[in-house]
Amino acid sequence: ATFFLLSWTHCWSLPLPYGDDDDDDLSEEDLEFAEHYLKSYYHPVTLAGILKKSTVTSTVDRLREMQSFFGLDVTGKLDDPTLDIMRKPRCGVPDVGVYNVFPRTLKWSQTNLTYRIVNYTPDISHSEVEKAFRKAFKVWSDVTPLNFTRIHDGTADIMISFGTKEHGDFYPFDGPSGLLAHAFPPGPNLGGDAHFDDDETWTSSSKGYNLFIVAAHELGHSLGLDHSKDPGALMFPIYTYTGKSHFMLPDDDVQGIQSLYGPGDEDPNPKHPKTPEKCDPALSLDAITSLRGETMIFKDRFFWRLHPQQVEPELFLTKSFWPELPNHVDAAYEHPSRDLMFIFRGRKFWALNGYDIMEGYPRKISDLGFPKEVKRLSAAVHFEDTGKTLFFSGNHVWSYDDANQTMDKDYPRLIEEEFPGIGDKVDAVYEKNGYIYFFNGPIQFEYSIWSNRIVRVMPTNSLLWC
């Protein structure tokens, strides 16, 4: 591992390919950045590899592995979606390849482990730092037989420190953003140690980088876990702020850590969140909307992003794009002429322009004219040609007039009367090419606006190419 840093500019024989449509958009800086990223996180060249004369993985192979890891279209070309992922702040541990200077073991042989906070970041108080690490260790001790004890001097199993740039382990940090932290797997010397880049702004909130979230991830590495391909997992390599509410370790991480250490005596949170499977025959959806030519499909803490030119839908945590939004979405719709997407949860709604929440939001749904009895919406769809927006709640539908900014008279109406045959509730809805697509559990109805009737009934998951 010592010498993979020496190879940045010398061990590459193949140029990095890029998408044909992106020729004019990619700068030399983009290409250099992408090569550095791939060398760092996909089969980094190590001293052991050099001594053994191991075959150097080509740039294209690394790029394909990276695209596969993140669920992107595996094109072997450097396109915009690939660069977008590369630019996100992340853990410094490779996704594919060895990250260690000394021999590693798969797990700790003992269940009673010690940790020591060697130094502190100036960004938050000492007590906040200590609380963040205490909570982070508890994430793992809650689901395993592991016990963690803090010591204040001497050498602990897990030594925790903050540093900048080159900080003594041959894996230098890179300044603000980019690489946030790294940790070593169980083993002697550096084994188990976790290092945090003090050029980042560490916080106890959604601002900067939340120390608890990053610490919990890094300690997963300290205990023997590699990165997960599951975008909902704590061990997914990209940083995402998960919200103020009580953190629950996702099921993927529970399965991983218990495969090493077994379960604990009593799990305080037996229901761990799972990542939705797009081809689940029982799949139901929370909300659907278009956004600048793409389709956004919300389910639990996630959304799938469907691009017309891409085969595979991409799955993301909602908070990875909009940290200030709630984890779950009730309804959503796009207003193309205003370049806005509206998101609803409970009695609140947000207006978004791309990644940005508009000033003055969230607002209350009562501002739109809903009575206080309406506590949440189940679906919404906007019609650009008429300026009308339909809102669904319970077994009723409302019609909102954009021009007058009021609800239309004679509403609400019963869903079954307004759209015969689709049932008395709607989970999600969107409009395309003169058809309205209503989703109710695992079934979707294609409804013709012109003939006022259902023309097709399909599985919900067919929207995701299943």
Curated annotation (Swiss-Prot):
Compositional bias ranges of the Basic and acidic residues kind: 268-279
Translocase in keyword set: no
Xref: InterPro entries: Hemopexin-like_dom, Hemopexin-like_dom_sf, Hemopexin-like_repeat, Hemopexin_CS, M10A_MMP, MetalloPept_cat_dom_sf, Pept_M10_metallopeptidase, Pept_M10A
The name this protein goes by in its record: Collagenase 3
Cofactor note: Can bind about 5 Ca(2+) ions per subunit. Binds 2 Zn(2+) ions per subunit.
UniProt-annotated binding residues for Ca(2+) 5: 288, 332, 380, 429
Signal peptide: 1-13
PANTHER family in alphabetical order: COLLAGENASE 3, MATRIX METALLOPROTEINASE
A molecular function GO annotation: serine-type endopeptidase activity
Binding-site residues, Ca(2+) 4: 286, 330, 378, 427
Region (Interaction with TIMP2): 171-241
Hemopexin repeats: 276-325, 326-372, 374-422, 423-466
Phylogenetic classification of the source organism: Eukaryota, Metazoa, Chordata, Craniata, Vertebrata
Disordered as annotated region, ranges: 258-279
Positions with a binding annotation for Zn(2+) 2: 91, 217, 221, 227, 235
Pfam family, one: Hemopexin
EC numbers on record: 3.4.24.-
Residues that, per the record, bind Ca(2+) 1: 123, 198, 200
Lineage: superkingdom: Eukaryota
Binding-site residues for Ca(2+) 3, renumbered to this chain: 174-175, 177, 179, 197, 200
Enzyme class: hydrolase
Cofactor section: Ca(2+); Zn(2+)
Subcellular location: Secreted, Extracellular space, Extracellular matrix; Secreted
Modification(s) after translation: The proenzyme is activated by removal of the propeptide; this cleavage can be effected by other matrix metalloproteinases, such as MMP2, MMP3 and MMP14 and may involve several cleavage steps. Cleavage can also be autocatalytic, after partial maturation by another protease or after treatment with 4-aminophenylmercuric acetate (APMA) (in vitro). N-glycosylated.
Glycosylation (residues): 112, 147, 404
